Amino acid sequence: MAEKFIKHTGLVVPLDAANVDTDAIIPKQFLQKVTRTGFGAHLFNDWRFLDEKGQQPNPDFVLNFPQYQGASILLARENFGCGSSREHAPWALTDYGFKVVIAPSFADIFYGNSFNNQLLPVKLSDAEVDELFALVKANPGIHFDVDLEAQEVKAGEKTYRFTIDAFRRHCMMNGLDSIGLTLQHDDAIAAYEAKQPAFMN
């Protein structure tokens, strides 16, 4: 079972760029592994570092700013996660420590992959995201409260409502990935298999 997501309070980092694609999130040269760990070191590699080996941090990239170290909520712009359909993108984000991405819109495949990996993609309107960027930039180090059960983001003195479809919400709140969902029906699967003719087993 995956980790349950019900509520999360975390430091917010503002990535003020639209159309952030999966190659920017995790460049293709780091996709050799099929396990989910180890990708956080290369998250936004071409932006975070000045050299190809990832040894020289780029002081002008927001994730390297001291006030955003330990951030677990990423505030982004529209069409986040566009480009090729690599599941490594949410792997890199979660391995780095992100639990939530807030944006006006997401690429469809990235959006689905995020739920499969316990990364909550929160859609808010353009105007609401503009408000949040202004709030975070005026208050570096601010934390947001994200409540999946209530489907709310509390930021400063305001609360923002978002909607997640019931099935995905249920899965995240109960820590169910595709394997976990299958195991919920383990008894029924075993009973069905027991009824099959011997030559089918």
Curated annotation (Swiss-Prot):
Q: In which pathway does it act?
A: Amino-acid biosynthesis; L-leucine biosynthesis; L-leucine from 3-methyl-2-oxobutanoate: step 2/4
Entry's EC annotation: 4.2.1.33
Keyword annotations of the record = Amino-acid biosynthesis, Branched-chain amino acid biosynthesis, Leucine biosynthesis, Lyase
Pfam families given for it? Aconitase_C
Is the keyword Metal-binding in the record?
A: no
Q: Which GO terms describe its molecular function?
A: 3-isopropylmalate dehydratase activity
GO terms under biological process: L-leucine biosynthetic process
Q: What class of enzyme is it?
A: lyase
Instruction: State the GO CC annotations.
Output: 3-isopropylmalate dehydratase complex; cytosol
Under catalytic activity, the entry for this protein gives:
(2R,3S)-3-isopropylmalate = (2S)-2-isopropylmalate
Task: Cite the SUPFAM superfamilies for this sequence.
Answer: LeuD/IlvD-like
Relate the assembly described in the record: Heterodimer of LeuC and LeuD.
**According to its UniProt record, which protein family does this protein belong to?**
Belongs to the LeuD family. LeuD type 1 subfamily.
Q: What is the recorded name of this protein?
A: 3-isopropylmalate dehydratase small subunit
Q: Which organism is it from?
A: Escherichia coli (strain K12)
The gene that this protein is the product of is leuD
